[in-house]
Amino acid sequence: MKHWRNPYLVVRVDGVALVDFSNNEERIFKADELPDALAKLPASAWPYGRVVAVQENSVQGGTQDAVLIRRNRGILAGTLESMHVLINWVPSA
């Protein structure tokens, strides 16, 4: 998905990461911080319109991690829906 040009998010145990492929960076946000972070992105970060790619972190340490990721995924999906942003779910590696 390195050719994806809209925001790319990874659901993690500790929140949601906004991936910047050009700098090989991940900025981690709590669910309530994500709307502001996405709103601060320039219009050029949204060439496909109001859609983001979302992937779950494939590295999990057990049942508790899976529960936290599932929780964060649900919060993220609800947040993006309330912002009228579509989700392109990407399978975990």
Residue ranges and their predicted role:
Residues M1-A93:
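Long, low-hydrophobicity, acidic/polar, solvent-exposed interaction domains
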